[in-house]
From Swiss-Prot:
It comes from Micronycteris brosseti. Pfam families: Cytochrom_B_C, Cytochrome_B. Component of the ubiquinol-cytochrome c reductase complex (complex III or cytochrome b-c1 complex) that is part of the mitochondrial respiratory chain. The b-c1 complex mediates electron transfer from ubiquinol to cytochrome c. Contributes to the generation of a proton gradient across the mitochondrial membrane that is then used for ATP synthesis. The keyword Transmembrane helix applies. Heme b b562 binds at residues 83, 182. GO terms for cellular component: mitochondrial inner membrane; respiratory chain complex III. This is Cytochrome b. Belongs to the cytochrome b family. The chain crosses the membrane at residues 33-53, 77-98, 113-133, 178-198, 226-246, 288-308, 320-340, 347-367. Binds 2 heme b groups non-covalently.
Length: 379
């Protein structure tokens, strides 16, 4: 008798995606982050759902409702901190996942890659709107500063900003719509994840060597299910440690002060996972130029497949490209540090240098290095 998982219309789909899926035998731990991101999304949706049961999206009561969740709701504090720090874990996994794709040339699967970029933008939008909901000082001023950037768009900018605000400033209407979108987007993200996996399973997974692995495949279960569970345990341990021992480590103290439109915080800055993009935005003195650089800092990923000049897919056997890749990582860490510093000497000039280097590595140095390595190998 045939196993039900291979015949049942619904179970058959799950079986072909999670059990009998042929996977390359050489996948390293860098391939764990896809499943970890799935778990992060599930955790965020579940904790978010329970938080939404107690949260009120009104300027008069939003801050107090978050306080009420932490003080009066059974285990409300752990829900709130799991949700806030879960977002940080989400972005750590996201950036490592994208980094893996860049290092091993997974961007050559263009459909999967482009859906991934779309997912990255969707998660960033969701995180930004979520940061506004507690209605603390940094929530209010962060929302004001970032939405105001759209006013740099010629001709329609000012109208667009007021349309998003639902008035002439960030106020009750803004908070209500941000809550609505923050609730809706994760479900759109979940649907996009399905499409992401659909395209991935059309081609099959890449592997560290970048060489087709059709001749050497193993079933996903039990080999990679066990491997993913190990990664999951490590991530959940890290998240639990963060939530239970130092829940406010990655947050901003200013957000424990209720939003006050009459009092600007000394340093307005986003959450740590947006600091690199914020540093690129600030490094250009012109408003429209800064906004363009901000968008391009992420959108540049879309043209990476076009800039691939090497005859090898992966960087595994390309030491010169490896050096550039790790220089890019160091540069992004520098930008993250600069984004959290005040706008003064020497931080401004360091930020400008790091921003130029960021775009130079991706647009110029990496393609040149790829061609150079081909020549060195006489290809």
């Amino acid at each position: 008798m045939t196993n039900i998982r291979k015949t049942h219309p619904l179970l058959k789909i799950l079986n072909n995606s999670l059990v009998d899926l042929p996977a390359p035998s050489s996948l390293t731990s860098w391939w764990n982050f896809g499943s970890l991101l799935g778990v992060c999304l599930a955790v965020q949706i579940l904790t978010g759902l329970f938080l939404a049961m107690h949260y009120t999206s009104d300027t008069a009561t939003a801050f107090n409702s978050v306080t009420h969740i932490c003080r009066d709701v059974n285990y409300g504090w752990i829900l709130r901190y799991l949700h806030a720090n879960g977002a940080s874990m989400f972005f750590i996994c996201l950036y490592l996942h994208v980094g893996r794709g860049l290092y091993y040339g997974s961007y050559t699967y263009t459909e999967t890659w482009n859906i991934g970029i779309l997912l990255l933008f969707a998660v960033m939008a969701t995180a930004f709107m979520g940061y506004v909901l507690p209605w603390g000082q940094m929530s209010f001023w962060g929302a004001t500063v970032i939405t105001n950037l759209l006013s740099a768009i010629p001709y329609i900018g000012t109208d667009l900003v007021q349309w998003i605000w639902g008035g002439f400033s960030v106020d009750k209407a803004t908070l209500t719509r941000f809550f609505a979108f923050h609730f809706l987007l994760p479900f759109i993200i979940a649907a996009l994840v399905m499409v992401h996996l659909l395209f991935l399973h059309e081609t099959g997974s890449n592997n560290p060597t970048g060489i087709p692995s059709d001749s050497d495949m193993i079933p996903f279960h039990p080999y990679y299910t066990i491997k993913d569970i190990l990664g999951l345990l490590i991530m959940l341990t890290a998240l639990s440690t963060l939530v239970l021992f130092s829940p406010d480590l990655l947050g901003d103290p200013d957000n424990y002060t209720p939003a006050n439109p009459l009092n600007t915080p000394p340093h307005i800055k986003p959450e740590w996972y947006f600091l690199f993009a914020y540093a690129i935005l600030r490094s250009i003195p012109n408003k429209l130029g800064g906004v363009l650089a901000l968008v391009l800092s992420i959108l540049i990923l879309a043209i990476v497949p076009l800039l691939h000049t090497s005859k090898q897919q992966s960087m595994m056997f390309r030491p010169l490209s490896q050096c550039l890749f790790w220089l890019l990582v160091a540069d992004l860490l520098t930008l993250t540090w600069i984004g959290g510093q005040p706008v003064e000497y020497p931080y401004v000039i360091i930020g400008q240098a790091a921003s130029i280097l960021y775009f130079s590595i991706i647009l110029v140095l990496m393609p040149i290095t790829g061609t150079m390595e081909n020549r060195l190998l006489k290809w």
